[in-house]
From Swiss-Prot:
Entry-linked SUPFAM superfamilies: Cysteine proteinases
Stretches for region Disordered: 25-83, 134-226, 238-290
Biased composition (Polar residues): 176-192
Subcellular location: Secreted
GO cellular component, one term: extracellular region
Signal peptide positions (record): 1-27
Naturally occurring in which organism (per UniProt): Staphylococcus aureus (strain NCTC 8325 / PS 47)
Name of the protein: N-acetylmuramoyl-L-alanine amidase domain-containing protein SAOUHSC_02979
Induction notes from the record: More protein is secreted in a secA2 mutant, while less protein is secreted in a secG or double secG/secY2 mutant (at protein level).
One MF term in the entry's GO annotations: amidase activity
Biased composition, class Low complexity, residue ranges: 147-156, 214-226
Amino acid sequence: MPKNKILIYLLSTTLVLPTLVSPTAYADTPQKDTTAKTTSHDSKKSNDDETSKDTTSKDIDKADKNNTSNQDNNDKKFKTIDDSTSDSNNIIDFIYKNLPQTNINQLLTKNKYDDNYSLTTLIQNLFNLNSDISDYEQPRNGEKSTNDSNKNSDNSIKNDTDTQSSKQDKADNQKAPKSNNTKPSTSNKQPNSPKPTQPNQSNSQPASDDKANQKSSSKDNQSMSDSALDSILDQYSEDAKKTQKDYASQSKKDKNEKSNTKNPQLPTQDELKHKSKPAQSFNNDVNQKDTRATSLFETDPSISNNDDSGQFNVVDSKDTRQFVKSIAKDAHRIGQDNDIYASVMIAQAILESDSGRSALAKSPNHNLFGIKGAFEGNSVPFNTLEADGNQLYSINAGFRKYPSTKESLKDYSDLIKNGIDGNRTIYKPTWKSEADSYKDATSHLSKTYATDPNYAKKLNSIIKHYQLTQFDDERMPDLDKYERSIKDYDDSSDEFKPFREVSDSMPYPHGQCTWYVYNRMKQFGTSISGDLGDAHNWNNRAQYRDYQVSHTPKRHAAVVFEAGQFGADQHYGHVAFVEKVNSDGSIVISESNVKGLGIISHRTINAAAAEELSYITGK
C-alpha cells in the first residue's frame, strides 16, 4: 500500500472516520465472499494485460481531470469515482482518490521540532492548522472582528493561490502527451513550487498590520469597558449617583454660605479699617473703663542661660480660683445638658474676662466670654486687642451686654450649640460627642473664636493649671476641696519670681509693657509713677519727677527702649523690667506683649546694647 494511503488509513481508523461512517468489516462476514472477489480480481489481471494497461491509462487521465475539477470547484470533489481502481465499500480508496494531491503533500510536511512525522503534525496539516494554536482559541469580543478580518484575508489570498495553481496545472496537462507516465508526478510537484513563496507574501501583510490591529483592539476593549461601566452605573447605581449629586450640591452650598458668612467673633472689614497700634497709656481717647482686659501667661526662664525655657505657664492667682468657684456649678450643669466641655467653658471665661476682673465682665455688662454683637438689643463698645500672628493691633468693637453672669453662661452655650447666622454648625467640632478631648475642642476654637495664634495653647494651660477637667465628669466635684496654695517666693532669692498683678487701680492699659512694669516693680517693693505716658517718654518724664535715671544697668529697675531701638515699636518705644545683671555686663529682662497677646517672656541683652539703654530706679 502506498505511503499516502497508510497515513490516511491511520487517521481514518484511529481518529476521525470511525465516528463518522459505519464499520467496513464484521466478525460474521463470510470469508469466502472476500476470497472469491480476490480470486476474480487476480484472474482478471492475469488474463488481460493490455486491458489493464488501457484501463490504467484511462484511470490516470480521469484522476488528472478529477484533480483539476476538484481545485476549480470543491463542491464536485466526491462526484467522479473510477470503478476499476476503487471499490465503493473501501473508504480508504474513496478518501485517497478524492483528496487533492496538494493536501497529500501537506500531510508529508516534517515536524520542525522533531524532524520527523508525528500524529500531531498530520492532524495539523490535514486541517490546515498552519498557525499558532492560540489563534483557534475562543476570541474576546474586542478581538473577534480583528481575527475574522485577518482570517478572511488569509482565505482570500489562499483561494487566489489555489486558483492560479489550478490554471497552471490545466495548461500543463494540455501541453503534455497523455502517454507520459511521469505526468502524475509532475502534477503533484507543480502546485508545490510556488507555495513556499506565495504564503510568505500573503502573511507579510498581516504581520505588518499587527500593531495597528492591536491598537484598534485595545481601543475597542477600552470603549467596551467604558460602555459596560456606564451601563452598570446606570442600572445599579442611580442611588449612588443621586447621593453624590446631592453631596456635591450641599458642599457647594455650604462653601458659598461660609464664604458669605461673617463671623461676629472675628474683626470685620470695617473694624480693620480703623485699627491702630495698641496704646501704652490712657491718653487722649483711650480710657481705662473702655479697655478690655484678658488673662496673662508667662514663659519660665532658664536659670542656667538666662533665656526662655520654652515652657508656657499660667500666672497663678487666688482671684482666679475664687472666680472658678463662683461659676463652676452653672458651668457643670450647662455642660452636661448641652454636650459641651465645662472645662473649656470655664477656661474661656478666665481668659476672656481676666477672671472676672475686666470692665467688660463686671456689672453692668457681665460679659464673661468676650462675645461680640448684641444680646436682646443691648451692646457696649470696648477697645480690644487683636492679633495678626504676633503683631498686635487695637480695634473698637461692640460687645454683648447681659443682665447677669448666668445669662452670659447660657448665651455662650447657645452660641456653641447653634452657631452663627449662615453657619449653624461652626462650633459643632467642639461638642463632647464630636471632639475626642478638650484639646480637640480648643484647637477648633483657635480658628473660629479668636485671632490669637496662641489661643488653644493658653486654654490648655489654664485647664491643666487649675485642674478644670474634673468639671467635665458627670458628678459635680466638691468645691470645698477645690483649693491650691500659691507659692511664696523670697524676694532676695536669685530665682525668678512668677508674675502677679498686685494693684487693683491700674493707670496703664492691661497687658501692655507699661502695665507690666508698673505691676512688676510693685511686686518687688518699689513703685513708679502712673502718669509717665508711652514707653519712649518714661526716661525723660521720670527724670523730671526726680527719679534716678542712668545708663548703668541695675537689678529690678525699669529699662527704657527709645522708638525703634533694638526692635522696639517705631511709634511708642518699649519698656521692660531688669531681672538680673550678669557679670559680663549683659542683662536678663522680662517683658509683656513681645511674644504675643498677654504673654510675659524673657530675653538676654548683650553688654554693648545694655549700655545704650536708659534705666529708672523706683522709689
